[in-house]
């Protein structure tokens, strides 16, 4: 029998990625929704009173699915409401830290750095994603001539750059320091393939172009097709800025050495995440020197499923 799943997210890109990765691995019959709670219910999610914000939402009516997978704080009231209205027949799954008691759900996955515990809780160091080795291989093949058109003496180094968030300023000075470190790699004959994210500041592009002006490199900064997956598939080595748990998790999937360019800032959650990564030899810091070691593909999606 085919399992029907409803996937409910808070609408953030990171939550959508994790939700789709798990739900699609479980079933092909999935319908996706954003919680879309209005004020004041959005402000009091994930607490029980926020279920009032789901009343009257005509999207969530019988027949109910076999499973509800929710991701993100604002998706909690929707999942709770569906469990109650289905008389418990919907198996409810929550991804990330529910903030409330995990026993409200049938199953909870949370990242280890969130310190969520319970008999129905599973944790992993990395988060789920929808990448597969076949996807990376296909993307790498289609981008090969654009990303690395000629024979090089060094390695193909993929650089994944994020941007500021509420924990890290990732200012001009830090970007200049990263660019200077990348220059050292270019001078050693390595091929640099750089991808910026939607959070990257506009001045990052100018800093990179000015610093690397005398060297051959590839830079994607939001225009045209995104080579992100191709970079993961083609790189011999990956460097990732330390502002995104999801981006670091995806970088750990191919099985090549991953180094993190750590940023100034403070977050207990991020710090615990980094401690787990370093202790498990998932990554090493990047300070201008490539470090090689035998890494292995890491895939939390399979573990969670």
Model-predicted regions and their roles:
Residues 2-6:
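Extreme N-terminal starter segment of soluble prokaryotic enzymes
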Residues 7-129:
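Active-site and donor-binding regions of nucleotide-sugar-utilizing enzymes
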Residues 33, 110, 192-198, 259-262:
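Short internal beta-strands
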Residues 103-171, 286, 290-296:
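A nucleotide-sugar donor-handling region in carbohydrate enzymes
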Residues 164-195:
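Conserved catalytic-core segment of nucleotide-activated headgroup transferases in glycan assembly
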Residues 208-246:
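Donor nucleotide-activated moiety binding/catalytic core segment of transferases
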Residues 233-235, 253-257:
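Conserved donor-binding/catalytic loop of nucleotide-activated donor transferases
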Residues 275-305:
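Leloir-type glycosyltransferase catalytic cores
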């Amino acid at each position: 029998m085919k399992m029907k799943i409803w996937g409910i997210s808070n609408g953030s890109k990171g939550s959508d990625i994790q939700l789709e990765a798990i739900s699609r691995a479980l079933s092909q019959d999935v319908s996706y929704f954003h919680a879309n709670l209005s004020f004041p219910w959005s402000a009091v999610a994930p607490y029980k009173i926020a279920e009032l914000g789901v009343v009257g939402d005509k999207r969530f009516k019988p027949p109910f699915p076999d499973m509800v997978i929710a991701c993100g704080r604002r998706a909690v009231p929707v999942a709770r409401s569906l469990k109650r209205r289905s008389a418990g027949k919907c198996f409810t799954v929550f991804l990330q830290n529910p903030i409330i008691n995990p026993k409200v759900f049938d199953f909870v996955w949370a990242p280890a750095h969130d310190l969520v515990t319970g008999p129905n809780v599973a944790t992993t160091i990395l988060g789920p994603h929808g990448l597969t080795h076949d996807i990376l291989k296909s993307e790498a093949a289609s981008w090969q001539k654009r990303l690395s058109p000629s024979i090089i003496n060094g390695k193909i180094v993929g650089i994944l750059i994020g941007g500021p968030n509420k924990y890290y300023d990732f200012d001009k000075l830090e970007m200049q320091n990263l660019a200077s470190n990348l220059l050292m790699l270019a001078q050693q004959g390595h091929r640099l393939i750089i991808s910026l994210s939607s959070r990257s500041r506009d001045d990052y592009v100018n800093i990179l172009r000015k610093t690397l002006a005398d060297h051959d490199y590839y830079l994607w900064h939001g225009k045209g097709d995104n080579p992100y997956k191709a970079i993961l598939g083609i790189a011999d080595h990956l460097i990732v800025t330390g502002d995104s748990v999801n981006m670091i998790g995806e970088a750990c999937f191919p099985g090549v050495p991953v180094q993190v360019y750590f940023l100034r800032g403070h977050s207990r959650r991020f710090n615990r995440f980094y401690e787990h990564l370093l202790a498990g030899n998932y990554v090493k810091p990047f300070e201008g020197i490539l470090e090689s070691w035998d890494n292995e593909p890491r895939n939390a999606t399979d573990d969670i499923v």
